[in-house]
């Protein structure tokens, strides 16, 4: 499989991010558990072969993240039927300049909402990363980690594309200092039926 692999701390959000997003999708059911609002940031350095979202690789793609968009995200997230926010891309952890203030605001104003994020970093790589990435990680509930590996593609997997990726309970993992898999993981027929419906 081909993708880029950084040395610890090599890719810095403050050097790469242009403060841009590819898309914002409110009220969807595909990017994690429950009804979610999904923010797709611009820019990714991993460049996984077979990536379904190649259009997000450029840090100059999309549109600027604005205060107006943030207000819309907060208003949508405040709806009682919305479970939480999902961060995707692109690579969320290379866009900490826009995501850290947003996530801090959510934790302060809407603490009952959960936050999911996808990342190309593995948990083990993340533990060696820069303080901004670790701060963002500390405020996330669920992390889907690891590069997409086309050779391990599996449509039966819940919320991920290849079997090397994990759905990690971040808070339990940080407390126990070891990877703790999300306790609602449900790979198999039910996931396959969901994928077919999409």
Per-segment meaning from a language model:
Residues 1-40, 53-59, 179, 186-192:
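N-terminal [4Fe-4S]-dependent radical SAM core
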Residues 141-149:
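Non-cysteine beta-strand/loop elements that form the S-adenosyl-L-methionine
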